[in-house]
Amino acid sequence: MKLTIPIPPKPQSRPRFDSRNKRAYEKRDMTNYKKTVSYYAMASKLKRIEKGPIMADICFYIYPPQYILRVKKNRNLLEKEVLYCDKKPDLDNFFKAITDAVNGILYKDDGQIAAIVCRKVYSLNPRTELEITELRDEK
């Protein structure tokens, strides 16, 4: 099953702690991002994978910074979406945010994820493309 989330990817933020109530909480913009991703996942009406191992193939398309946009030879690479992003934020933080948001919607539990293919690519059209496939046991 394939899903495209047409909003710029956002990395998982660190939990914040409230000293008065002694509780951990998430920043509001992170909560809003996860709700938006969940909305797109539910609106896709894809069938949830209830059990068994799955593979997540995720590509995060990130809008490039100005220093990359200024170079003419990069323009063609950006249009082809083949210029990899090797800067912060870390790939695992993007992965955590997206898998938390679709947990319970596209699959029952994120513990089902047994294989991962993840990429960060610069693009003029920021979005996240997610493909979930069931892994079959070979007998």
Where are these regions (language model features)?
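Acidic, proline/glycine-enriched N-terminal capping motif
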Residues: M1-K139
